[in-house]
């Protein structure tokens, strides 16, 4: 007589969930590798699109805001100023979007096979992490071109900034993915939301331009990340640790909300997706 395994849905996130994700780490790798191959399948330049997108955005912003509008850039050349911000913004926004759609894009698997559903959002971010490192090549080139030699201690904070960006996109993405399963409007609204969020994040302008309203920008967790990245890489100013702590606090709230919502809806994914 064959053994029957009953898998009961869990309402809360626990250490066992992390152990389960670790047990399925090879499947996580497979999902990430599959997403990466599908993204650049039948393209002429392949993964180089990861460079092309932020690079062209840098060119357009440099012409419009740097040359025509004479946007201040904290005393550094505008192209490298904006590209540093774009690099982290692209990672965050692409990850948030991909995590939000990760369940519905894999509905055939979700409805048929059991595995930790968190693997799909994590794989989506892992794919964008590869794009981040590829796109970083341009930043290195710009640093050599403009003669920037960042301090080793400054660069050591980059992994921390990546973790904050990772968690911000994961927390927000899990919340949106949970809603997106039932209400597909999310996938249409999100691009417009991200466009608006770009302009309330100091990507194309320094936060100092907001004057007395700069505190509003600090609510955005990516504000602290982007300012710290510029401080670390370009030396525009000392790292604002208080602002970075605010980013961590905002990310912690996002993670709690996202995980709670995801675990609450997880039992219904296969039924309503």
List each language-model region with its residue ranges.
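Hydrophobic transmembrane alpha-helices and immediately adjacent juxtamembrane helices
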Residues: 1-273
């Amino acid at each position: 007589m064959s053994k029957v395994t009953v898998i009961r849905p869990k309402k809360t996130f626990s250490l066992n969930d992390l152990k389960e994700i670790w047990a399925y780490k090879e499947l996580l790798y497979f999902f990430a590798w599959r997403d990466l191959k599908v993204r650049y399948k039948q393209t002429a330049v392949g993964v180089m699109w990861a460079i092309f997108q932020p690079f062209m955005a840098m060119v357009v912003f440099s012409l419009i805001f740097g040359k025509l509008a004479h946007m201040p850039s904290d005393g550094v050349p505008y192209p490298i100023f904006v590209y540093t911000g774009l690099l982290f913004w692209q990672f965050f926004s692409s990850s948030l979007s991909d995590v939000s759609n990760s369940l519905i894009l894999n509905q055939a698997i979700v409805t048929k096979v059991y595995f930790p559903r968190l693997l799909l959002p994590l794989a989506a971010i892992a794919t964008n992490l590869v794009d981040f490192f590829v796109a970083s090549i341009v930043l290195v080139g710009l640093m050599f071109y403009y003669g920037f030699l960042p301090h080793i201690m400054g660069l050591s904070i980059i992994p921390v900034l990546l973790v904050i960006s990772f968690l911000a996109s994961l927390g927000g993405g899990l919340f949106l993915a949970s809603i997106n399963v039932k209400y597909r409007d999310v996938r249409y609204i999100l691009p417009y939301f991200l466009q608006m969020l770009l302009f309330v994040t100091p990507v194309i302008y320094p936060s100092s331009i907001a004057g007395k309203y700069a505190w509003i920008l600090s609510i955005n967790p990516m504000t602290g990340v982007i300012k710290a990245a510029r401080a670390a890489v370009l030396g525009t100013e000392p790292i604002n640790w208080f602002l970075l702590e605010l980013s961590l606090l905002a990310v912690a709230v996002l993670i709690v909300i996202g995980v709670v919502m995801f675990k609450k809806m997880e039992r219904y994914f296969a039924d309503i997706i």
